[in-house]
Amino acid sequence: MLRGARSHLSASVALAAVLAAALLSSFARCSLPGRGDPVASVLSPYFGTKTRYEDVNPWLLGDPVAPRRDPELLAGTCTPVQLVALIRHGTRYPTTKQIRKLRQLQGLLQTRESVDGGSRVAAALDQWPLWYDDWMDGQLVEKGRQDMRQLALRLAALFPDLFCRENYGRLRLITSSKHRCVDSSAAFLQGLWQHYHPGLPPPDVSDMECDPPRVNDKLMRFFDHCEKFLTEVERNATALYHVEAFKTGPEMQTVLKKVAATLQVPVNNLNADLIQVAFFTCSFDLAIQGVHSPWCDVFDVDDAKVLEYLNDLKQYWKRSYGYAINSRSSCNLFQDIFLHLDKAVEQKQRSQPVSSSVILQFGHAETLLPLLSLMGYFKDKEPLTAYNFEEQVHREFRSGHIVPYASNLIFVLYHCEDAQTPQEKFQIQMLLNEKVLPLAHSQKTVALYEDLKNHYQDILQSCQTSKECNLPKVNITSDEL
């Protein structure tokens, strides 16, 4: 009976997915502006963590599978011997929480009184169906699978020695348990299959020559396993004070009034959360289907900058420099990366083949941001607060430019045969979103491997996740009892 119920549920979900895809396809065929629409393009830089990868790397709009070799990449007598990549999942559906807020907003529109000669945007939204459903809940979309397949093709072309056919069986893949990450890892493998076997359909991941992706949430979702983070940040009602304060601040109030006028609803019926989900709906429609939604017409660039800052405040205080535990909770992941690199160095020194030339780890924006913060990247002189929006217009910390969908942080270890000293034989570069990332401490584009380890010595040797994440014990004296 239970099996039959499950089969019926699966069939219903599958049918809903097909209908949703067909509905979206019909939207795209209607006389709607496409990806090159000017309004969508001017808002795109401000979508925060809901940003398309190609908006960070515009050259991909021309040819999404052609690699772009950064001129700063090492070449000549230095040969890449290992690549360790931390990859965010591809484009996804909104979460159930976001979908329910959108339904609430649509309900407000349906109950408003129509006004003759009223807002063109409000009229367009009246005709725009709400196609999101609860079952979608953050799952990877087909565009997200495409993100991963194309990234695989580009990396394989950029580092042919590492992604050679002989190394395929020795690939190591780690993933978060979330479906969007598991599915992203599978799509990446399909892209590699396409690289090795052009024109042939890929088999199931379980039938490929390499080992299937292995779930490891202690690495990819370290924040869920850090009691200090969970208590002091995740479950702490005051931890995101600056986020909540900005929601009621003058910048957001200006946006609220403008949006209320555009939608023809009382301003008291709106709040910052509803406004933000409307803005994200513009980004979802663009990212998932490449269509220009009427939700995009609700906002202008000034509104977008305010809403981007609201999103960045949350990322800053919950995942980055706002609290030390945000980044210190990622020490285990950072150390794991260097364990792989150390092993490769040791094997090369012994004239042995590198056992794992490519290690791929699939996680979340919440995986990447703390790690980059731990390494000292994108840190502004002044913290982001609810009260310095104007001063932070040119800030370094813009989450959409750092961790869009499919974002990736790559460590490339090189063996330099003609090095003058033993220390120079092993050098390292980092790439963020396929562009060489200058070292945070020196701004150089390449480092001796030992020098980089020395710079991060405290993290590699002294940062123990068990100690970092333990809550301080509260001593209760007999007087207090």
Curated annotation (Swiss-Prot):
Positions of the catalytic residues: H89
Enzyme superclass (EC): hydrolase
Subcellular localization: Endoplasmic reticulum lumen; Secreted; Cell membrane
Organism placement in taxonomy: Eukaryota, Metazoa, Chordata, Craniata, Vertebrata
Carbohydrate attachment residues: N236, N475
Biological process, per Gene Ontology: intracellular monoatomic cation homeostasis; phosphatidylinositol-mediated signaling
Modification(s) after translation: N-glycosylated.
E.C. number(s) listed in UniProt: 3.1.3.62, 3.1.3.80
Protein name: Multiple inositol polyphosphate phosphatase 1
Recorded coiled-coil stretches: none
Record GO cellular component, one term: endoplasmic reticulum lumen
pH note: Optimum pH is 5-9 with 1D-myo-inositol 1,3,4,5,6-pentakisphosphate or 1D-myo-inositol hexakisphosphate as substrate in absence of magnesium. Optimum pH is 7.4 with 1D-myo-inositol hexakisphosphate as substrate in presence of 1 mM magnesium.
Family indicated by similarity: Belongs to the histidine acid phosphatase family. MINPP1 subfamily.
GO molecular function, one term: inositol trisphosphate phosphatase activity
Pfam name, any one: His_Phos_2
Protein's organism: Rattus norvegicus
Keywords assigned: Cell membrane, Endoplasmic reticulum, Glycoprotein, Hydrolase, Membrane, Secreted, Signal
